[in-house]
């Protein structure tokens, strides 16, 4: 099969020679039945969803409950990011570092080329041009994903600015990231397709120097929507290192005081630590308002005024469904309720609506995420998968900040790090300076969640919530953070804080109510920036006392507040060998600044003896 005999290649709506030659090369390798350029139109979405319903991949939901929305149930083997099959194939192994899987790029290209050979037989090869972030940006980051999955094309319309407008932005000679994806399930003539095609063999591979992504075998979001973690974190972090900016696993939140002054927060939390809930916060303190600019990824660059400005490169929310409800995140529920949403691996109700654990009103009967009957009180397994998702347009969020599409971004006042820890880490701590803040982020540990493979509940170090997403050596990444702090005067840099909403008391009870009440912690942070609030200088940084927090109207015991804020030297002594082990794992590239901060912590602890 040659490119000349593949329908659609000869009518490509572009004169970009490098793009055209790449498309021909991939088509000749993968043997698709046809090539289609995604234009991103609503008509195309309609055709895609109809095709997906006919294939059994999508089920149309009740339009009265969720208009223009669909449910997809994946293969049970294809439900999450596969970190064990995710590779950073830098030219030199040392540049991938100890946190990434590495293979020689030539060897990986050879292996995957053989997997791709004929892999799109019987399928459509979709060409999906996309733009990460507002297209009016000074330096827009563009990409083209080739995929044989209509599920991916439909989801990319929600998650990115894709289609004809992005192709026009690339122009005749613009740079773009090459993102190649296949589910790895070729169809022979007359062969019946699966509702969720995938392959037991999976590779999610990144070539940082050439800015390429090759993905094979998985149809699941993080492995297949290549604009998401693959581009906007792994490849973009390598770009950011080379170009002097930051690509981070962070929400962007706008908090507005009663005086109508806006403060912008960028916050890094590992999966299932309340990132989306905080991004769509409903403050409980009178007079305070919050708006969202993003729930997952922030790209941050220094402006001419020396401040750090953030944009969200995404166009939609790809949120974890279980636990999302009208109490924990009413704004996410309103966003979803507006429709145009793709749900994956949640349960189906008898009236064609969706349900998941944590939603109010458990139905007596459901079809679970595996397609089986599920009965309340009888079926022992969860109805929705723990990593089930909603994919929904950002533009529908009722508290979307007007600046969400501003190519200049917003000036960040606060960088928040957070994690899920039952003990040790207080509710909120302020870093002493930028380098100390980097140390806080570099040493964060969080309990394992369902969003990635691995044992749930064990604590793993997850620096800046970027452990699975750094596109280069973790030691160089820490040094990059330290170096960026020297780009500007300390007074212009965001102030760094660390939060832990998840500390527990006796009997495993959460000490802090969380959700909207977290606005009380953010108010203290704002007051610290404005030099209006007190705090205690502790072993680990500045921590408020109970009287420093605005607790008016909150039903919480003073004992619980004190325990939530406590800094226990014995617990921190237990943490020292864990930090030491982590730094030894980072190896020779650990910056001296991080070792200095660790020694300072040890010395402060020694004085407590």
Curated annotation (Swiss-Prot):
GO terms for molecular function: GTP binding; manganese ion binding; phosphoenolpyruvate carboxykinase (GTP) activity. The gene is pckG. Catalyzes the conversion of oxaloacetate (OAA) to phosphoenolpyruvate (PEP), the rate-limiting step in the metabolic pathway that produces glucose from lactate and other precursors derived from the citric acid cycle. Its cofactor is Mn(2+). GO terms for cellular component: cytosol. Substrate binds at residues 81, 220-222, 271, 387-389. Gene3D superfamilies: 3.90.228.20, Phosphoenolpyruvate Carboxykinase, domain 1, Phosphoenolpyruvate Carboxykinase, domain 2. It comes from Mycobacterium leprae (strain TN). It is found in: Cytoplasm. Pathway: Carbohydrate biosynthesis; gluconeogenesis. Its EC number is 4.1.1.32. PANTHER family: PHOSPHOENOLPYRUVATE CARBOXYKINASE, PHOSPHOENOLPYRUVATE CARBOXYKINASE [GTP]-RELATED. Monomer. Its main location: cytoplasm. The keyword Cytoplasm applies. It catalyses: oxaloacetate + GTP = phosphoenolpyruvate + GDP + CO2. Belongs to the phosphoenolpyruvate carboxykinase [GTP] family. InterPro entries: PEP_carboxykin_GTP_CS (IPR018091), PEP_carboxykinase_C (IPR013035), PEP_carboxykinase_GTP (IPR008209), PEP_carboxykinase_GTP_C (IPR035077), PEP_carboxykinase_GTP_N (IPR035078), PEP_carboxykinase_N (IPR008210). Keywords: Cytoplasm, Decarboxylase, Gluconeogenesis, GTP-binding, Lyase, Manganese, Metal-binding, Nucleotide-binding. This is Phosphoenolpyruvate carboxykinase [GTP]. Binds 1 Mn(2+) ion per subunit. CDD domains: PEPCK_GTP. GO terms for biological process: cellular response to glucose stimulus; gluconeogenesis; glycerol biosynthetic process from pyruvate; oxaloacetate metabolic process; propionate catabolic process; response to lipid; response to starvation. GTP binds at residues 272-277, 389, 420, 515-518. The active site is at residue 273. Mn(2+) binds at residues 229, 249, 296.
